[in-house]
Amino acid sequence: MLELDLQRASQQPAPSDEQFRQWCELALRQRTADSELTIRLVDEAEGRELNHTWRHKDYATNVLSFPADVPDELLDIPLLGDLVICIAVVEREAAEQGKELQAHWAHLVIHGCLHLLGYDHIDDDEAEEMEALERTLLAELGHPDPYADDES
C-alpha cells in the first residue's frame, strides 16, 4: 500500500490526487513493501529557494527528489522520501517542448519516484536504464516517448 501525502502549496491548477496516486503506484509497483511518499507542489519562488539550497542552482527546476535516509525498520511504514514539483516549470516545459501537459506531469512524477528507488542518470548506462523504464511506464499510460525529440 502507498501512503501518499500530497501537499498543494501553490494555488496553480495541478492534476488530481487520483492521478498522482496512479503515477506513483505505477512507478513504485516493483516495490512490494508498503511505502510512504510526500509530493509537495510549489510555486516558482519556493522551487527556486529549494533548488538553490540543495543543489546550489539559482532557478526553479521541474522536480526535486529527496530520498529518505531512515532505516525501514525504524518506521511503521517505510518512508521513500519527498518529491517537490514546481507547477510553473512543468507547465512552461510542456509548452516549450510541445508536450501534452498531462503526459509531462506523468513523466516527471514517474521520474522522481524512480530517483527515490535509487535510479539515476549521472552516467550514460544509468541514464539508459532509467529512461527505458520511464518509456515503458509512460507507454502503459498511453503517453508518447518523452525522449523522442532528444534523439533526433
Swiss-Prot record:
Its cofactor is Zn(2+). Keywords: Cytoplasm, Endonuclease, Hydrolase, Metal-binding, Nuclease, Ribosome biogenesis, rRNA processing, Zinc. It holds the Pfam family YbeY. Zn(2+) binds at residues 111, 115, 121. It is found in: Cytoplasm. It comes from the Bacteria. Binds 1 zinc ion. PROSITE patterns: UPF0054. Transmembrane segments: none annotated. Belongs to the endoribonuclease YbeY family. Single strand-specific metallo-endoribonuclease involved in late-stage 70S ribosome quality control and in maturation of the 3' terminus of the 16S rRNA. This is Endoribonuclease YbeY. The lineage of its organism: Bacteria, Pseudomonadati, Pseudomonadota, Gammaproteobacteria, Pseudomonadales.
